[in-house]
A protein has these predicted regions:
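N-terminal cap/leader regions of alpha/beta-hydrolase-fold enzymes
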Residues: 1-230
Length: 230
């Protein structure tokens, strides 16, 4: 069952797309959008998680704004104009809403993010170690100038990066992985050979959709989340 819901966000209100599994209950997973906004591809990912037994919530970090998949300039403008503090509040509020929802089970909240959402998934994991226990970022991570205080990060991170990615380079992913491993964090950032940025995205806006790789990765994501959250 899918619905648009509202939730408190630090004295204000935000909205999101909530999908429950057929049984109505399961562990909670936050799904964080790409730079386009809360689009059909992100809703599809939430639905796929629900089909695998999770209660999935994708918060609308652009508060109703949306770029079409051929509007890259608009998508970039939306991403760069999004107030970081508001996005942090919205993600945190979404996590609390999800954790308190009837039917959400398990030991904590999982986070899956794509592109911009991959980057943000690292940030919310570092900010909310009290709730976030498992993170799967896809082709996105914070650049050095945006890195948070990693000291409180306790979630297990299993990231999936692209080999050919000018937005989030494999070299940057390797450097971040080495840094976090050096701090004793449980993290792996796998670079998938032959892939380009957004290789999981069904909209295929960059012409980089790789269905073969996606078919291998997705069951791993589901198994990882069940292992950490059930």
């Amino acid at each position: 069952m899918a619905e648009t819901i509202s939730f408190p966000s630090n004295g204000s209100e935000a909205s999101g797309y909530l999908v429950r599994p057929d049984g109505g209950s399961g562990p909670g997973v936050l799904v964080i959008q790409e730079w386009w906004g809360l689009d059909s591809a992100i809703k599809e990912m939430a639905s796929r998680l629900a089909a695998a037994g999770f209660v999935a919530l994708a918060p609308d970090l652009y508060h109703g704004e949306l770029a079409a998949h051929d509007e890259m300039d608009k998508a970039g403008a939306l991403m760069h104009s999004m107030p970081p503090d508001r996005a942090a509040r919205d993600m945190s509020g979404a996590i609390d809403y999800l954790a308190g929802l009837d039917g959400v089970t398990g030991s904590g909240i999982g986070v899956v993010g794509f592109c911009m959402g991959g980057m943000l998934s690292f940030l919310i994991a570092a900010a909310r170690p009290d709730r976030v226990v498992a993170v799967v970022p896809f082709y996105g991570y914070p650049p050095p100038e945006m890195e948070p205080d990693w000291s409180n990060l306790s979630a297990t991170i299993r990231g999936h990066m692209a080999e050919h990615d000018d937005f989030f380079t494999p070299e940057g992913a390797a450097a971040l992985e080495a840094k976090l491993l050096g701090m004793g964090k449980d993290v792996s950032l796998t670079v998938h050979p032959g892939t380009g940025h957004a290789f999981m995205a069904s909209h295929n806006a960059f012409g980089t959709l790789n269905e073969e790789v996606a078919a291998v990765i997705w069951p791993q994501v589901i198994a990882f989340m069940h292992d950490k959250l059930d």
